[in-house]
Amino acid sequence: MEFMHNLIPTVIEHTGNYERVFDIYSRLLRERIIFLSGEINDPKADTVIAQLLFLESEDSNKDIYLYLNSPGGSITAGLAIYDTMQYIKPDVRTICIGQAASMGAFLLAAGAKGKRESLTYSRIMIHQPWGGISGQASDINIQANEILRLKKLIIDIMSNQIGVDKEKLALDMERDYFMTSSDALKYGLIDNILVRE
């Protein structure tokens, strides 16, 4: 049964006398939807960036929808996605489904202002960057300084994106800071909670 987890669902589209089969992610991409699920790493970031650039080339005036269900991951991979979101012309709407933790929360907050959303029972978590450090004392010092630099960068960007004072944000990020969708709305991480009308 393990092989079942590796299957990607397909969608059959009927057009006239023809049928076309799409994997579900390609079909969503036609609707300008990108789905970022799981750990954020370099290969996943490359895929998301390619999709963002492709959708911009298709229509630079229509919003792109980035659905997030992620426990977080690599800071550098997340920053690459963030930079691309800010670089392209279309607004990127971010929608949390399930969870947006750590770098996932950072990307959720990076959506276009007024277009950052969450489903009702999603959870959002922010915290400071962390990393395992080993090696010689000089290497440990270099790595520690880099983690502190990245922490300051993340706080600066998030503070600007969500309008929370840097000192408060730094204090809240000292430990895992979990929020419901309602908490995230009050905090400024999202702009709307999506409910069925």
Curated annotation (Swiss-Prot):
Looking at the UniProt record for this protein, which Gene Ontology cellular component terms does it annotate, in alphabetical order? cytoplasm; endopeptidase Clp complex
State which Enzyme Commission number(s) the record gives. 3.4.21.92
Q: Which Gene3D superfamilies match?
A: 2-enoyl-CoA Hydratase, Chain A, domain 1
Q: Name one GO biological process term.
A: protein quality control for misfolded or incompletely synthesized proteins
UniProt catalytic activity: Hydrolysis of proteins to small peptides in the presence of ATP and magnesium. alpha-casein is the usual test substrate. In the absence of ATP, only oligopeptides shorter than five residues are hydrolyzed (such as succinyl-Leu-Tyr-|-NHMec, and Leu-Tyr-Leu-|-Tyr-Trp, in which cleavage of the -Tyr-|-Leu- and -Tyr-|-Trp bonds also occurs)
Where does it localize?
Cytoplasm
- Give the enzyme's main class according to its UniProt record, as a single word: hydrolase
Q: Where is the active site?
A: 102, 127
Keywords of this entry: Cytoplasm, Hydrolase, Protease, Serine protease
Q: Which GO terms describe its molecular function?
A: ATP-dependent peptidase activity; ATPase binding; serine-type endopeptidase activity
Which HAMAP family does the record match to this protein? ClpP
Function text? Cleaves peptides in various proteins in a process that requires ATP hydrolysis. Has a chymotrypsin-like activity. Plays a major role in the degradation of misfolded proteins.
How does the annotation summarize its subunit structure?
Fourteen ClpP subunits assemble into 2 heptameric rings which stack back to back to give a disk-like structure with a central cavity, resembling the structure of eukaryotic proteasomes.
Which family does the record claim for this protein? Answer: Belongs to the peptidase S14 family.
| Protein name, as recorded | ATP-dependent Clp protease proteolytic subunit
Q: Gene encoding this polypeptide?
A: clpP
